[in-house]
A protein has these predicted regions:
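Short, structured patches in soluble enzyme cores that scaffold and shape functional sites
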Residues: 71, 85-87, 108-110, 122, ...
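A structural signal for short hydrophobic beta-strand segments in well-ordered beta-sheet cores
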Residues: 74-76, 138, 237, 345
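Phosphate/pyrophosphate- and phosphate-bearing ligand-binding catalytic cores of soluble enzymes
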Residues: 3, 10-13, 55, 146-167, ...
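N-terminal start and proteolytic maturation junction detector
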Residues: 174-180
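Anion-binding (especially nucleotide phosphate/pyrophosphate-binding) glycine-rich loop
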Residues: 1-128
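Short acidic-glycine loop/turn motifs at beta-strand connectors
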Residues: 59, 77, 140-143, 205
Length: 348
């Protein structure tokens, strides 16, 4: 039932990586259950591919099964909508505009799928997907039972949820790069015990024209500031919560601070903007820029001069090129500012 030696690099936005030993696209929950059951029978490692917009496939490919849940439906009733995990965020946003449903204006131009957005609690402009989530339905890959959770049981955090944190025993091998020994992190893995099937969103009725205008503004913002002319995986690093910076901080004004690394005169002080994401953070892009890394390249990959928190595939980059730049950024930022950046991108 699986496709063999699948050119998986054709699906993620980076367009990088070797083949998957097996690939399967599930059109509904029953197909997904059968695929998981078959993978377990064959003792295959597997990971779940959504839109692939924050994913880096290794140069060697993936030795197990890549599962793509293409569960595509939108069913609405009043101000609520039940949405399949495979629905693209752009499709859901367009739906909300057409129906005059407010709540996702901030996500205009956000790539990826609903499942991926919920899993990683996607957010920007001080808003997060959790703000409108009512409930989430998932598949337990151990028991093959469907689980439905209310919002309060989904464990949403900064770019995380119970679905990204695992919630149980390992079943797949998608992992944050920060956990891999190759980048100097822990040698443990984060597993996905559950696969998101669908989510119910609670909107508020609004003016369709105003909602559409707000969405268009966010799309134009992204087009103007993000290096979308090159294959990329969006933000590589999470923004840095102000509360986690080990430094003496001087407030210059409401939106700007001066950071003085604590008890280490060899570290550099710097002035930085502060934004709500949704709590006070220093943008990772600004820190990378202050470290003098804009435009630095390795192989076919480059730290974008346009937005330094993007590492772009400028010319047939390898996964190893991307990983080398990620490691370089982490080391330079730590050495210069005593700040540890944490990856948002996922490796498989």
């Amino acid at each position: 039932m699986f496709q063999e030696n699948f050119p998986i690099h054709t699906l993620p936005s980076y367009k990088i990586g070797g083949p998957a030993r097996y690939f399967f696209e599930a059109k509904n929950p029953d197909e997904l259950k059968r695929a998981v059951e078959e993978a377990k029978k064959r003792n295959l490692e597997f990971f779940v591919l959504g839109g692939g917009t924050n994913l880096l496939i290794g140069d060697e490919g993936f030795p197990g099964l890549v599962l793509k849940p293409s569960i595509n439906f939108i069913e609405s009733s009043g101000e609520e909508a039940s949405v399949g995990a495979g629905v693209s965020m752009s499709a859901l946003i367009n739906f909300s505009v057409e129906r005059g449903l407010s709540g996702l204006e901030w996500a205009g131009g956000l790539p990826g799928t609903v499942g991926g957005a919920v899993r990683g609690n996607a957010g920007c402009f001080g808003r997060e997907i959790k703000d409108i989530v009512k409930s989430v339905k998932s598949l337990d890959t151990e028991t093959l039972r469907e689980i439905e959770r209310d919002f309060s049981d989904c464990g949403f955090g900064y770019r995380s949820s119970i679905f990204s944190a695992g919630g149980g025993s390992p079943s797949s091998v998608a992992e944050p790069l920060r956990r891999t020994g190759a980048l100097g992190g822990k040698n443990s893995r984060i597993y996905n015990k559950e696969i998101i099937l669908s989510a119910v969103f609670s909107f508020k009725k609004g003016d369709a024209k105003e909602i559409g205008k707000s969405v268009s503004e966010k799309i134009l913002y992204r087009l103007g500031r993000h290096p979308l002319e090159y294959p990329n995986a969006g933000s590589i690093f999470k923004n840095v919560p102000l509360s986690q910076i080990n430094a003496d901080i001087t407030q210059i004004n409401a939106d700007t601070i001066r950071v003085h690394p604590r008890n280490n005169p060899r570290k550099s002080a710097f002035t930085a903007p502060v934004k709500l994401d949704p709590f006070p953070v220093v943008p990772a892009a600004y820190i990378i820029s202050e470290a003098g890394l804009k435009g630095v390249s390795i192989g076919g990959a480059m730290i974008s001069p346009k937005h330094p928190n993007f590492i772009v595939n400028v010319f047939e980059a390898k996964s190893s090129d991307i990983k080398s730049l990620i490691n370089l950024v982490k080391v330079e930022v730590k050495n210069k500012f005593d700040i540890e950046l944490e990856e948002e991108i996922i490796a498989a």
